[in-house]
A protein has these predicted regions:
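Beta-rich, blade/repeat-based domains predominating
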Residues: 1-11, 40-56, 86-107
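Glycine- and Gly-Pro-enriched alpha-helical subdomains that act as flexible
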Residues: 4-34
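Conserved beta-strand positions in repeat-built beta-propeller and related beta-rich domains
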Residues: 7, 12-19, 56-62, 70, ...
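Repetitive beta-architecture junctions, highlighting loop-to-beta-strand starts
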Residues: 19-21, 33, 64-65, 93, ...
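Conserved blade-register residue in beta-propeller folds
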Residues: 23-25, 68-69, 118
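Blade-edge beta-strand/turn elements of extracellular beta-propeller
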Residues: 25-41, 71-90
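Short Gly/Pro-enriched loop/turn and capping motifs at secondary-structure junctions
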Residues: 43-44, 55, 62-65, 73-75, ...
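Blade-level signature of beta-propeller repeat domains, shared across WD40, Kelch, NHL, RCC1
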Residues: 94-134
Length: 134
């Protein structure tokens, strides 16, 4: 299950084992308000991240291998479908987590069952800050 914050830190998104994303208000003292149902359905349930516009990227977990992109208002904007493996034996497609990176933050790295996929986006994601001791 995944946790992501909105770019302004006012919302926390939590994916649940029953394929829901709940949205909580983050209070000024750091506590959480009551949740509202943000979105639910197939393609939700594992890792999630946000971009600079506040869109939420959620991975499907154990299949089908997709990343759903949902607006801050809860509207499905689109999906990223991972490749389907043909031949025998058939392998399950999954998308378990994702991270934004690259020099401009517009590369989305997606962890699959046995591969890592990358896709270039038009919008930057929230890239985690790194604390490097020199």
């Amino acid at each position: 299950n995944g946790i992501a914050l909105s770019p302004d830190g006012k919302w926390m998104y939590l994916s649940t084992a029953n394929r829901q994303i709940r949205r909580y208000a983050v209070n000024s003292d750091g506590t959480l308000g009551a949740f509202t149902m943000f979105t639910e359905g197939v393609g939700i349930g594992d890792g999630q991240k946000t971009d600079v516009a506040g869109n939420v990227y959620s991975t499907s977990g154990a299949g089908p291998g997709i990343v759903r992109i949902t607006s801050p208002e809860g509207k499905l904007l689109g999906t990223i479908n991972l490749p389907i493996y043909g031949g025998e034996p058939k392998r399950q497609i999954c998308a378990t987590n994702e991270a934004f990176g690259g020099t401009d933050g517009k590369t989305l790295f997606i962890a699959g069952c046995d591969s890592v996929y990358t896709i270039q986006l038009k919008i930057a994601g929230i890239v985690p800050a790194h604390n490097v001791n020199k």
